[in-house]
Amino acid sequence: MAKKAATKTPKYRDRSLPIPRRVADLLRRMTLEEKIGQLTQELAWKAFTNKNGRIEVSDDFRKILSGNGLGSLYGVLRADPWTGVTLDSGIGPREGAEAVNAIQRFAIENTRLGIPLIFNEECSHGHMAIGGTVFPVPICAASTWNPALVQKMTAAVAAETRAQGCTQTCSPVLDVVRDPRWGRTEETFGEDPYLVSRMGVAAVTGLQGKRLNSTGSIIATIKHFAAHGWPEGGHNAYPPHVGPRELRELCLAPFEACIKAGAQSVMSSYNELDGMPCSCHKGLLTGVLRDEWGFEGYVVSDMGSIKVIWQDHHAADDVAHAGARALDAGVDAEMSGGGYSQESIKLALQRGQITEELVDRAVRRILRLKFVLGLFEKPYCDVDRVEQV
């Protein structure tokens, strides 16, 4: 009787290989549709259902996944008036971990290559989920002038968040505030670029820990890049009026400090700088961030900020063109909006506005972090550990 041929383990599954080799092996196996899937970060507080304590993947998520996979999900456990999730309708920490595991398992088992998801959550001053510890808002934390305390606080936030299977946060906010009328001032570390830098580095260090594949570490996303905290009239997302020296010395200084400290994600902002929307500002996203500072992580857009390039800034012909401009500039993942949808990316490729190499570049950066996080080896969290944390 003939012996069944042994199935050879793909190189990207071999944890003994260097991460760049694993990324390269996985990337060459991917179809264009699977690559585009990795560029998307979908809103996901409706990705599961809770029927009398039974957690299941929702029909909405099944449709979104569509066989091509996704790069990441945003706000699976987010509970606040904006999502409509309340103490009555939401779920606690243990059930939250079960929900994240269920979604992750479905994504791995129902896609060809089984690429795990990154779960991105809001953690400005605690995991914005039911049962998360609530700490003082950043403006209050900065008032302590105690970076060591902020590092300890954010390490606790990271431990709670990772215990529920979530691996990234949309914080810290590094906007330097010079107009108290701006409605997001409490999210920041204040008006002084040196203090913002020191507190930002402390937060990044606390969130990311020594190794991103440890049980108490998550990716820190520094935001909003750039000059988002100085809007005209204090109106959110309005243009800032800053010159090149002010931009460098005041607005960019905290970002540079946090990149040097190892921050692995940057969020591009809604606003424009001197007429150029920040989410397609190649001089910032590639020239400064990568060429000058040596950033190796991935850039994610603020929610809908790529679509805003077209709709509000009128700097693109349509949403597909906006997506092409953002991808070329250096935005690797889109948080909602349609600029990086299957239809938009394919249309931009057809028009010659982007090349598949640009798609590969972004996917490569995202996959690298999934390997750094250890998600291919350990995609699920230990539900029993949640209550211990």
List the model feature ranges, each with a label.
Residues 1-389:
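Glycoside hydrolase catalytic-domain context in secreted enzymes
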